[in-house]
């Protein structure tokens, strides 16, 4: 499987899993009425509508901010998708696919509902992590993949410009 196809598979699976969990929990359960759902001593399902970006920063109540964030997400997805098309390692392709799938999943929420549906809350003792969703987890995993790819000898070699006379990477 080429790096691009691996990335495309990661993108599609991320998008499907993200939207399926959000739609299933919101429309297929009574979570909205009976939250929180205790999954483990350190994890709950809750309903949080995030009108901002990561960690709830830059909350947007108006329509202009909402659509600017949708446009920014789509522009980032297009740019990262073009990078994914040129990926030369499977790890890079998958990492970019996870990020693009997550960005598109959250953009769909923001366009449809004006906010992103977050539902996973991790906590222990007095410590509490922000509430997130599958798309957010995929974006974080993708960023970790980008870092790992950049640190690998193959990843560094893949980004080196071809020597004069070397063929361009095959798309």
UniProtKB/Swiss-Prot annotation:
Membrane-protein topology? Multi-pass membrane protein
Chief location bin: membrane
Q: In Gene Ontology terms, what is one molecular function of this protein?
A: aspartic-type endopeptidase activity
In short, the EC number is 3.4.23.36
Q: Transmembrane stretches, by residue range?
A: 7-27, 64-84, 88-108, 128-148
The protein's UniProt keywords, in alphabetical order, are: Aspartyl protease, Cell inner membrane, Cell membrane, Hydrolase, Membrane, Protease, Transmembrane, Transmembrane helix
Q: Where is the active site?
A: 118, 136
A Pfam entry, by short name: Peptidase_A8
What InterPro entries does this protein's entry cite? Peptidase_A8 (IPR001872)
* Pathway participation: Protein modification; lipoprotein biosynthesis (signal peptide cleavage)
Its localization reads: Cell inner membrane
Task: Give the protein's function.
Answer: This protein specifically catalyzes the removal of signal peptides from prolipoproteins.
What name appears for this protein in its UniProt entry? Lipoprotein signal peptidase
Give the organism the record lists: Methylobacterium radiotolerans (strain ATCC 27329 / DSM 1819 / JCM 2831 / NBRC 15690 / NCIMB 10815 / 0-1)
